[in-house]
Amino acid sequence: RGSILIDGMPTAGKKTYQVNRMGVARTFQNIRLFKELSVIDNIKVGLHESLRYDLASSLLRLPNYWKEEKKCTERALELLDIFHMADFANVPAGSLPYGAQRRLEIMRALATSPKLLLLDEPAAGMNPSETAELTETIRRIRDDFNIAVLLIEHDMSLVMGICEGIAVLNFGRIIAKGTPDEIRNNPQVIEAYLGK
């Protein structure tokens, strides 16, 4: 039991969009892209909260609408460029390889400009090459974007390779907290994962 605070504000009872406005974005274990939409349009979905035009501007295609849409497209292209996916901007998201779809989902979450990025088993179903690319993506988010990343993951090499602090759960109970070296040498962790 406990509570989650973002900048001192409780998240309990908040709707998803309210938590997002507090600066939290997340991805899910199962990829949730708009597979028929282009890669760039998937990222633009994450930017919708930042658009500053009203319904009339949108319906009538007034100048403010075009100005905001241009900014949105530029930001989406910037993210694609940063993560080396600009060549896929107009490709349907569903046609991307699995690892690229996962990175796209993370980029869409980043488009919301979060303070905290929650990643739920991002390496699930990935091959070693895709996991290596994902590791670099997460490291870059942490270092270059200065965003806190909360990672839920079973791939221990990924966790040990990028996390500064680790909490290990066994059947829903925290059995250890510490640095990668502390966790690697913790007898309770070794017993839980390798058995006696």
Give a label for each model feature.
Residues 1-196:
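Glycine-rich phosphate-binding loops of nucleotide-dependent enzymes
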